[in-house]
Amino acid sequence: MELGLRWVFLVAILEGVQCEVQLVESGGGLVKPGGSLRLSCAASGFTFSSYSMNWVRQAPGKGLEWVSSISSSSSYIYYADSVKGRFTISRDNAKNSLYLQMNSLRAEDTAVYYCAR
């Protein structure tokens, strides 16, 4: 009976454990047209190296727009036509980090940028 209670208690503890996914973006700022910025996203709470990752953005007063995607191993990379040739997505699985290098910035690139799993 005592052993059974221990197992019930252990299961109850494990069921209460939750893994919180966190994605924290940094690197934004003000730049003139034609300038560059590099965004970073620090990931935690999940096995980063197992997931494709994305950058999306939301311009003032508009909906979300997909910007770019990268596969878990960086083998497959995709860009929206609006940023192709100007933006470069990359990742460092050892650092659980996602990046977006943005060059030749335009006024229409003004937005809040989010990384997404």
Swiss-Prot record:
Gene3D superfamilies: Immunoglobulins. Residues 20-117 form the Ig-like domain. Residues 20-44 are annotated as: Framework-1. GO terms for molecular function: antigen binding. It is found in: Secreted; Cell membrane. Residues 78-115 are annotated as: Framework-3. Keywords: Adaptive immunity, Cell membrane, Disulfide bond, Immunity, Immunoglobulin, Immunoglobulin domain, Membrane, Secreted, Signal. The keyword NAD does not apply. Residues 53-69 are annotated as: Framework-2. Disulfide bonds join C41-C115. Residues 116-117 are annotated as: Complementarity-determining-3. GO terms for biological process: immunoglobulin mediated immune response. Residues 70-77 are annotated as: Complementarity-determining-2. Its main location: secreted. Pfam families: V-set. Residues 45-52 are annotated as: Complementarity-determining-1. GO terms for cellular component: extracellular region; immunoglobulin complex; plasma membrane. Residues 1-19 form the signal peptide. It comes from the Eukaryota. V region of the variable domain of immunoglobulin heavy chains that participates in the antigen recognition. Immunoglobulins, also known as antibodies, are membrane-bound or secreted glycoproteins produced by B lymphocytes. In the recognition phase of humoral immunity, the membrane-bound immunoglobulins serve as receptors which, upon binding of a specific antigen, trigger the clonal expansion and differentiation of B lymphocytes into immunoglobulins-secreting plasma cells. Immunoglobulins are composed of two identical heavy chains and two identical light chains; disulfide-linked. This is Immunoglobulin heavy variable 3-21. It comes from Homo sapiens. The lineage of its organism: Eukaryota, Metazoa, Chordata, Craniata, Vertebrata. The gene is IGHV3-21.
